A protein has these predicted regions:
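Short, surface-exposed ligand-recognition loops at beta-strand->loop->(often short) alpha-helix junctions
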Residues: 40-47, 94-95
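Alpha-helical polar/charged "hotspots" used for coordination or helix-helix interfaces
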Residues: 38, 90, 97
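A structural feature that tracks compact, well-ordered secondary-structure segments
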Residues: 92-94, 103
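Amphipathic alpha-helical segments
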Residues: 44-60, 105
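Vicinal oxygen chelate
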Residues: 2-38, 61-80, 102-146
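Short alpha-helical
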Residues: 47-48, 99-100, 121
Length: 146
């Protein structure tokens, strides 16, 4: 996983969290001190997974990555099941309308895991390539960070 930071200030850009998980600090312009830059996922067939992620709303770029909401998804060749325990539960993206994404998922035959209607958010969880769960989350008018 990569986090965008406004300045490295001499810090090592790679933080080893153990168990094969690293956070890479990417120095770039950002609206806050820390922001999501990218997520890298293993896939047995990255080309096929890329097509499936595009159907879920991710857009390809010239560098071979997929973009959504200003962050990047990198697909790397490898066995997605080659871990003792999962380190990623799901990828969440903020959307204007969960209902639109649900209708599109149903039309495309995407497997829906569940819909969660919480007091301040509405969320749709679908199964993406290599059984990675994707959450589309919509903030209701009552949503507030304070």
């Amino acid at each position: 996983m990569g986090l965008r930071v406004s300045a490295l200030d001499g810090r090592d850009p790679v933080v080893d969290l153990g168990e094969g998980l690293e956070i890479v600090l990417v120095e770039a312009e950002t609206d806050s001190e820390l922001d999501l830059d990218h997520i890298a996922l293993l896939s047995a067939d990255p080309a096929a997974a890329e097509v499936q992620w595009q159907a879920l709303g991710f857009a390809p770029d010239a560098k071979g990555r997929l973009e959504i909401g200003g962050a990047w998804l990198e697909l790397r060749q490898g066995d997605p099941d080659d871990h003792d325990r999962p380190l990623l539960n799901h990828i969440g993206v903020l959307v204007d309308s969960v209902e639109e994404h649900q209708a599109e998922a149903e039309e495309l035959g995407v497997e829906i895991d569940r819909v969660v209607d919480a007091p301040n958010t509405l969320a749709l969880f679908v199964w993406g390539p290599d059984r990675v769960k994707l959450e589309y989350v919509e903030h209701k008018p009552s949503f507030s960070l304070s």
